[in-house]
């Protein structure tokens, strides 16, 4: 009963209005009130401020400044093995695995269309049919900048307007084509592991999506698909990013989806749904390496995993079931 009510709210609530209101409030300088909100947020979600470059919450003028806070360099070491692709974000893996022709797993028993995710771009979809995908959810407690899994040359970016459904266990189980319906920014890269797409998916109260090369992509929300292209290689105007380098960020966060071409990478065996991710740890390994590297994510403290799962709505809450 309670789950049905929550799901109904996803369709009834004015999500765009709520998102605009949240974005407006998060950008305001409110002095002591801003600090109070940040302190309450840190306490409720168990945010580890020791990892931040500025651990003192009084140093943030707005909630947005706090939310996209940079981390100290040493807290997210990047796996330097050239055959290893690394995790692009802190969070929890929602789903991962093989793209079955044109189908991507959203939740148990629920798939969505690769072409729909890519806004009907069948040429781009052809690059990833029968390839590999990873969906990473960023909970409120997480670091909300997104980094590169490997070296890449940006070739194309597409902004796709859409809904702003929440991204959680309940909606994943009940909202068809959730990630293909929500607002998103698709980034296509040339890499030494073949083409790679990194998709930043919006949700309710995600105030904006930004990239390091173009700044704020949304808002404004104009309701039309926008497409940009860049030259290859070392041509004038090309955008090259290194493994582990920041590529974008959420102001109030959501989900990152990675797509890899077929036969190019193998996901790290230890990873599964609800695995906790940390930027720089191994995500996948090239299929062309002759010696399989030691690509196992470093074990995390039990309290860190528990805090991440507590903050993640991907974890089914049995108390809500009636």
Swiss-Prot record:
Pfam families: PS_Dcarbxylase. The active site is at 90 (charge relay system), 147 (charge relay system), 254 (charge relay system), 254 (schiff-base intermediate with substrate). Residues 308-322 have a biased composition (Basic and acidic residues). Its main location: membrane. Residues 293-322 are annotated as: Disordered. GO terms for cellular component: plasma membrane. One of its GO terms (biological process) is phosphatidylethanolamine biosynthetic process. InterPro entries: PS_Dcarbxylase, PSD-B, PSD_type1_pro. It catalyses: a 1,2-diacyl-sn-glycero-3-phospho-L-serine + H(+) = a 1,2-diacyl-sn-glycero-3-phosphoethanolamine + CO2. Is synthesized initially as an inactive proenzyme. Formation of the active enzyme involves a self-maturation process in which the active site pyruvoyl group is generated from an internal serine residue via an autocatalytic post-translational modification. Two non-identical subunits are generated from the proenzyme in this reaction, and the pyruvate is formed at the N-terminus of the alpha chain, which is derived from the carboxyl end of the proenzyme. Its EC number is 4.1.1.65. The modification Pyruvic acid (Ser) is found at residue 254. The keyword Lyase applies. One of its GO terms (molecular function) is phosphatidylserine decarboxylase activity. Disulfide bonds: none annotated. Pathway: Phospholipid metabolism; phosphatidylethanolamine biosynthesis; phosphatidylethanolamine from CDP-diacylglycerol: step 2/2. It is found in: Cell membrane. The record marks 253-254 as: Cleavage (non-hydrolytic). Transmembrane segments: none annotated. HAMAP family: PS_decarb_PSD_B_type1. PANTHER family: PHOSPHATIDYLSERINE DECARBOXYLASE, PHOSPHATIDYLSERINE DECARBOXYLASE PROENZYME, MITOCHONDRIAL. Catalyzes the formation of phosphatidylethanolamine (PtdEtn) from phosphatidylserine (PtdSer). Belongs to the phosphatidylserine decarboxylase family. PSD-B subfamily. Prokaryotic type I sub-subfamily. Heterodimer of a large membrane-associated beta subunit and a small pyruvoyl-containing alpha subunit. This is Phosphatidylserine decarboxylase proenzyme. It comes from Escherichia coli O9:H4 (strain HS). The lineage of its organism: Bacteria, Pseudomonadati, Pseudomonadota, Gammaproteobacteria, Enterobacterales.
């Amino acid at each position: 009963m309670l789950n049905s009510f929550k799901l109904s709210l996803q369709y009834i609530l004015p999500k765009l209005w709520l998102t605009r209101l949240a974005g407006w409030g998060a950008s305001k300088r409110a002095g002591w009130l801003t600090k109070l909100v940040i302190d309450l947020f840190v306490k409720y979600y168990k945010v580890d401020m020791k990892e931040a470059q500025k651990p003192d919450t009084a140093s943030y003028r707005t909630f947005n400044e706090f939310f996209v806070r940079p981390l100290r360099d040493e807290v997210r070491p990047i796996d330097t093995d050239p055959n290893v692709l690394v995790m692009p974000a802190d969070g929890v893996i929602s789903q991962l695995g093989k793209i079955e022709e044109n189908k991507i797993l959203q939740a148990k028993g629920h798939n969505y269309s690769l072409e729909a995710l890519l806004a009907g771009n069948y040429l781009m979809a052809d690059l990833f049919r029968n390839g590999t995908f990873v969906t990473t959810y960023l909970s409120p407690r997480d670091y909300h900048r997104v980094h590169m899994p490997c070296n890449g040359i940006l070739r194309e970016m597409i902004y796709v307007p859409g809904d702003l459904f929440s991204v959680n266990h309940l909606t994943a189980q009940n909202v068809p084509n959730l990630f293909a319906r929500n607002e998103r920014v698709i980034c296509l890269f040339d890499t030494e592991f073949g083409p790679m797409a990194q998709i930043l998916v919006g949700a309710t109260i995600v105030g904006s999506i930004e990239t390091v090369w173009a700044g704020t992509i949304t808002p404004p929300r104009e309701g039309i698909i926008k497409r940009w292209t860049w030259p290859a290689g070392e041509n004038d105007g090309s955008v090259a990013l290194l493994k582990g380098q920041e590529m974008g960020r959420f102001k109030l966060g959501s989900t990152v989806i990675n797509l890899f071409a077929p036969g190019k990478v193998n996901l790290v065996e230890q990873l599964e749904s609800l695995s906790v991710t940390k930027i720089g740890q191994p995500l996948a390994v090239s299929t062309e390496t002759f010696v399989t590297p030691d690509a196992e994510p470093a074990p995390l403290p039990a309290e860190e995993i528990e805090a991440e799962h507590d903050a993640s709505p991907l974890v089914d809450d049995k108390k809500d079931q009636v």
